[in-house]
Amino acid sequence: MLCNRTCPSSDCGILCNHSVPSFPPFHSSVANIHFTKENNLKSNIFEHNNNSPTLRSSSVACNTCLKIIRNDSFHCTKCFDFDVCRDCYAKQAFLHPCPKPHFVLVRSSIPSVASLTCSVNSMSVSPQSNFMYAICDHCEQPIHNVRYKCSVCDDYDICESCLTDNSHSNTHAFVRITKAYPHGLPSFHLFPQFLSAELFESASTVHRSVQCDNCLAHPIVGPRFHCLVCEDYDLCSSCVSHVHHDHHSMLRLTREISASPLHLSKPEKPKVLNFDFKLVEDSILPLELSPGCPFYKIWHIRNTSCQSWPSPLYVKFNGGDKLFPGDNPYSFPITSSVHPGEDVNFTVALKVPEKSNKEIFTAFFNICSDDGSVFHKSLCAFLRVPKSFSRISKSSF
């Protein structure tokens, strides 16, 4: 496309985007393309506005569609790691929490196939590389082929390279996943392996009562992989990469946790208490929040059942978005019995996410007794974040 401005030449191969309103004005061209003896493609990419070129590696994923960026993209200079591919930028189909975003065009270090009519073999990305639709929480790079997901936390994934040196809790076991899930993968919500890091360190790395079902090694020394689909099927670290069904998730256990074979099942549902209540009012403190700011969510409820509630009572997280660090938020306990018709305030300490592409956050909580029993109705915390992420008012809840 030629622009209405004065260009050096209409035959110089200049690509003009002045007439496209979705992109900032620029002229760019690809020059000095040559092949080495190793058939590696090299190019010098420059812009006519005399700015220094910015090259992009092929390992960056779009923060909107999560696809690997092959061509040019846009990077927010105000943020540490926020990139949008050209398609999502043109459609304006992305949510960015930065108060004052400033996007700059970033050139791909590998020219596109369409523009250079080169073969697919010249690309540096292996055709066998399988994107797992997840970003490593340790190295912040896209995860390929093998994904390790925390079995306890809602959203924590690492790649195979970061498995041994990640800083995540060693009491949490990881699940080995080899199947890509484009539409997301539900959390496993298993219990931690050990109650404390001290118990984990004191446990043995030899799984005395377990035998590898492939090489028949007994006992399994080092990481043990337990199939979450099959009944009583375990593999050692040497066999897990080339045997068994590719799409079966395997729980990775680094320490011995029992003297008998592991039989995983869903946790027993807690006892349900048929106490009824009515939500009178809910509020937050402070009234104005900013990213990363801690706050209190308060539910003012009334006992509408015919009997008194036992004490103590707590609020426990039951799903949705995690608006708190750790496994559960701090809840202020109700230390006295609540009689029919009486009002009580349940308060939980939460925190506004510091960086997120989401606009709406929803978290659910249960009222629990001291023995783990739960009320049959849940409490909900709803948070709507403005696109500017500069102010969050009380009306957002």
From Swiss-Prot:
It is found in: Golgi apparatus; Endosome, Multivesicular body; Vacuole lumen. Zn(2+) 5 binds at C212, C215, C236, C239. Keywords: Endosome, Golgi apparatus, Metal-binding, Repeat, Vacuole, Zinc, Zinc-finger. One of its GO terms (molecular function) is zinc ion binding. One of its GO terms (biological process) is cytoplasm to vacuole targeting by the NVT pathway. Autophagy receptor that interacts with and facilitates the transport of cytosolic hydrolases Ape2, Ape4 and Lap2, and of mannosidase Ams1 into vacuoles. This Nbr1-mediated vacuolar targeting (NVT) pathway depends on the endosomal sorting complexes required for transport (ESCRTs). NVT components colocalize with ESCRTs at multivesicular bodies (MVBs) and rely on ubiquitination for their transport. Gene3D superfamilies: 3.30.60.90, Immunoglobulins (2.60.40.10). Zn(2+) 6 binds at C227, C230, H244, H248. Zn(2+) 4 binds at C150, C153, H168, H172. A zinc finger (ZZ-type) spans 57-112, 131-182, 207-258. One of its GO terms (cellular component) is Golgi apparatus. CDD domains: NBR1_like, ZZ_NBR1_like. Its main location: Golgi. It holds the Pfam family N_BRCA1_IG. This is Autophagy receptor Nbr1. Zn(2+) 3 binds at C136, C139, C159, C162. Zn(2+) 2 binds at C76, C79, H96, H102. InterPro entries: Ig-like_fold, N_BRCA1_central, Znf_ZZ, Znf_ZZ_sf.
